[in-house]
Regions:
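C-terminal nucleotide
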Residues: 1-91, 101-138
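Glycine-rich nucleotide-binding loop
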Residues: 95-97
Length: 138
C-alpha cells in the first residue's frame, strides 16, 4: 500500500510540473521519478535515514521546479524545524495554501512542535496535527 500511496503522490506532481512549461520541469520530472523509487525502497528496507533524505530532497526539487512553492518564511520555518524538532520537511498543498509536512525527531511531541512554532515563528498560525503512519515500518 505504501508504494501505491507514494507513487501516486509523486507521479501526480510529475504530471503537474511537466505540463507547466517550466524549463526546469524535465530535470525535476526525472529526479522526482528517481526519488520515488528511492522512497519506496527506503520504506521496504525500513531505512529511516534514507526516507528522511528523500522527503528533504523532494522539498528542494519542488522549490527548484517552481520558486512559488516556497518563500523566505516557509524556508526559515523548515530550516528551524530541521534544526530543532524534525528530521525531514516538505510542503504539501496547493497555491495560496497548504502545510509543512514534518517527520519529527524521536521523542518530539506535537505539543513541543506547537510551542516551538509559537515561540520561534509567532507570525504563523500553527495548527499542528500529528499523524502516526510509519510506526509499523520503523
Amino acid at each position: 500500500i505504501w508504494e501505491t500511496v507514494f507513487a501516486f503522490l509523486f507521479n501526480n506532481l510529475i504530471y503537474i510540473y511537466t505540463c507547466s512549461g517550466n524549463k526546469n520541469s524535465l530535470f525535476g520530472h526525472t529526479e522526482i521519478r528517481r526519488l520515488n523509487d528511492r522512497l519506496v525502497n527506503s520504506i521496504r528496507q525500513s531505512d529511516y535515514e534514507e526516507f528522511c533524505n528523500c522527503i528533504n530532497r523532494h522539498f528542494e526539487l519542488l522549490k527548484f521546479i517552481s520558486p512559488l512553492v516556497s518563500n523566505s518564511k516557509i524556508d526559515k520555518l523548515s530550516a528551524d524545524c530541521l534544526e530543532f524538532v524534525a528530521d525531514a520537511t516538505s510542503v504539501c498543498g496547493a497555491g495560496g495554501g497548504g502545510y509543512l509536512f514534518a517527520v519529527l525527531k524521536e521523542g518530539v511531541t506535537i505539543n513541543q512542535v506547537e510551542e516551538f512554532i509559537n515561540q520561534k515563528h509567532p507570525y504563523i498560525k500553527s495548527h499542528a496535527k500529528q499523524i502516526q503512519l510509519l510506526d509499523e515500518i520503523w
